[in-house]
Amino acid sequence: MQGNLPPEAQEKLEQLQDLQEKAQNVATQKQQAEQQLSEAETALDALGDIEESTTMYREVGELLVETEYDNAHDDLDEKVSDLEVRVETLQKQEDRVQEQFESLQEELQDMLGGAGGAMGGGPGA
């Protein structure tokens, strides 16, 4: 099908495919960040149930290193804040890519006479 398209339409179709790949990458990154955020929030909540005098350890590479309660709390709190910003940033990026995709898809459909063309949707396809 791509061989029958005008060069401008083929270029738009390639851009659409690139945007689709980018959207999938952003969605994957967002999902990973959301999972990390959930885990960090759970750890922070669990830390709230532990006495401050309890011996604490944190993972450093392959090692467990003793740490102070306040340090562990501060580190987790900072991690949660950073991940919240990351998730928000990725959501905005995901929205922006989706808008670009929809706009480009509309341009391509207009270019192909609104019949759905390469998207396979219209009666003239």
From Swiss-Prot:
It comes from the Archaea. GO terms for biological process: protein folding. Belongs to the prefoldin subunit beta family. Gene3D superfamilies: 1.10.287.370. Heterohexamer of two alpha and four beta subunits. InterPro entries: PFD_beta-like, PfdB, Prefoldin. This is Prefoldin subunit beta. NCBIfam families: gimC_beta (TIGR02338). Signal peptide: none annotated. Pfam families: Prefoldin_2 (PF01920). One of its GO terms (cellular component) is prefoldin complex. Molecular chaperone capable of stabilizing a range of proteins. Seems to fulfill an ATP-independent, HSP70-like function in archaeal de novo protein folding. Coiled coil: none annotated. Keywords: Chaperone, Cytoplasm. GO terms for molecular function: protein folding chaperone; unfolded protein binding. Its main location: cytoplasm. It is found in: Cytoplasm.
